[in-house]
Swiss-Prot record:
Belongs to the imidazoleglycerol-phosphate dehydratase family. GO terms for molecular function: imidazoleglycerol-phosphate dehydratase activity. It comes from Methanococcus aeolicus (strain ATCC BAA-1280 / DSM 17508 / OCM 812 / Nankai-3). GO terms for biological process: L-histidine biosynthetic process. SUPFAM superfamilies: Ribosomal protein S5 domain 2-like (SSF54211). This is Imidazoleglycerol-phosphate dehydratase. It is found in: Cytoplasm. It comes from the Archaea. Keywords: Amino-acid biosynthesis, Cytoplasm, Histidine biosynthesis, Lyase. Pathway: Amino-acid biosynthesis; L-histidine biosynthesis; L-histidine from 5-phospho-alpha-D-ribose 1-diphosphate: step 6/9.
Amino acid sequence: MRVFEVERTTNETNIKLRLNIDGTGNYEITTKIPFFDHILSSFVKHGSFDLSLIAEGDLEIDDHHTVEDVGICLGMAMNKIEKKNIKRFGHAIVPMDEARAMVSIDLGGRPFVVGNYIPKRDKVGELSTENIVHFFESMANNGNMNIHFEVIGENEHHKIEALFKAFGIALDNATQIDERKGIISTKGVI
């Protein structure tokens, strides 16, 4: 079983998480940002991970540090995965009513994010929509992963939720074990 724990404390946040890559979609998530909890739960459920996450942040200022640092910690956990015999690449397309999200991932050690999500409103619940892309940047930079995504739709809730579901499915695909593969790189290392 591939289980990774990360604890990170700064002057802005205190985060503790336990991530089981080979889980079944169970979660206990508390960030005190209800919509963020909701989309993280969707990510976990559709990625078939198990996640225990407690995040305390300086929400009296805003939600930026909490969202960013959760992305950092999830990336740190993902970066602990043994790269030998994983599929490395994953992708998913998820519709949600009028919205659709497409995500492609490479766990090849090259952090980069390319995406087209541009929010049409400032917040969904208490979550600042401008932090969505920053969450993925934080996760990519600390998880050494390449993330590409495209989102279409009208409803911000639907677009964001479809994106997190697709991200979970793509990440699940990329982390699957394939004994035939070895290290998936012509360099011989990731």
